[in-house]
Swiss-Prot record:
Residues carrying a glycan: 265
Protein name (record): Choline/ethanolamine transporter FLVCR1
Gene: FLVCR1
Outcome of substituting residue 253 to V: In NEDMISH; mild phenotype; uncertain significance
Gene Ontology CC terms: membrane; mitochondrial inner membrane; mitochondrion; plasma membrane
Amino acid sequence: MARPDDEEGAAVAPGHPLAKGYLPLPRGAPVGKESVELQNGPKAGTFPVNGAPRDSLAAASGVLGGPQTPLAPEEETQARLLPAGAGAETPGAESSPLPLTALSPRRFVVLLIFSLYSLVNAFQWIQYSIISNVFEGFYGVTLLHIDWLSMVYMLAYVPLIFPATWLLDTRGLRLTALLGSGLNCLGAWIKCGSVQQHLFWVTMLGQCLCSVAQVFILGLPSRIASVWFGPKEVSTACATAVLGNQLGTAVGFLLPPVLVPNTQNDTNLLACNISTMFYGTSAVATLLFILTAIAFKEKPRYPPSQAQAALQDSPPEEYSYKKSIRNLFKNIPFVLLLITYGIMTGAFYSVSTLLNQMILTYYEGEEVNAGRIGLTLVVAGMVGSILCGLWLDYTKTYKQTTLIVYILSFIGMVIFTFTLDLRYIIIVFVTGGVLGFFMTGYLPLGFEFAVEITYPESEGTSSGLLNASAQIFGILFTLAQGKLTSDYGPKAGNIFLCVWMFIGIILTALIKSDLRRHNINIGITNVDVKAIPADSPTDQEPKTVMLSKQSESAI
């Protein structure tokens, strides 16, 4: 390819970034040592950039205002865009180093702590429903009362999501994490004082606090992944953060039937078993709150990706929470995703809440196996989540993957519905696992797809709205499916969910895939976001600009 010539005059069209004072730098130069070689000799005008001391600044000024000059000798002229302020300065001006991108080892600690206290919160959500008949007999209340111990998680989320996301956007990640972990711990201790048959209201109070804690937990996976992890691992990190919540649901399906067996004839033993479960949960929640206070940091020293560097460079006063909400609701693809995510996740919440009742309808006395089926459903979903996260990091095929998983979840729900009453419980284990693999595996897909199509809006806000939609659909689906199950049997309730999931497939197919964050990370910018050129050891190779006589005029 020909080198740039020495003709005077503007070689770049007005309005292009090169016309605003960008310097072409040799692609192979290491960070901090890039150089521009002027025309008057091999080292006549060479100067390092990226914050290092400069030589021949006057010569550098000539590059900006004078004739086009060739770069350092290379077979081809390959350059990446560097703001002129970083490479050439007026005499006496202070150097302005470029923002660096790097990965912090602490990111794994932050992810682990979050995943663990999210696990405990999810465990407390499902610990009543999976042994609903036991708590129904102990407290002397109806099944609807026990269902509300689960649905209060969904109910509390809807009105509190907006102040919670505002807090996350304005006060930061650490304070939000402390509130989530702290309220989770407090709610667990309150429930320890409810182990008497007339104190159902106390256990409801503790569960309400845990449900408020959930508001400060569910919106964090995509924010933690974006703030702490590089572009090649962000989807996997998000899936891992969601995995903690799913694992908590799995443990909630497994442990309560084992720790609190159905001993209605011995109330004292039953109370002792419930107390053991509550105190054990409180001890773990307390330990995790302490770890959160010690080790959970706001953000790493350096941004992990080009997209985060661009966001951190934006002036804070330009951010408006109300404007961000309006932008999200004007984004038609996001609105469609909001509905489809709510349908899928709401169906999962409903199935999880009513699983014990569905199983006991056809398999009397199988409380323990009902918990194991729930465990199978969630563990299979955990595998699905990780595989989907790895697949997204590798392919970036967000819409295609989301649509395929949605279709397979629908097929799994249909199979589960029509095999539940075959009287072979092993079949329910298999179909429950298939359903969980795709239905639970969908959860991180929705988060990451939302971040992609709404960038640069806050990840916490988009995730929070997705979760609010899930809670609303979860309440409606649980009430409707519970009523249908009581009046007509589990099959009627499950068919109700199948119809809604089919609608979700149609709406998912209509979503336009605009991967804004991914485009920033690979160097493609749009009018809304300015990418900051900074090297990262894990980022994709920076895009290059090939300069020649023909390409200069074509730009």
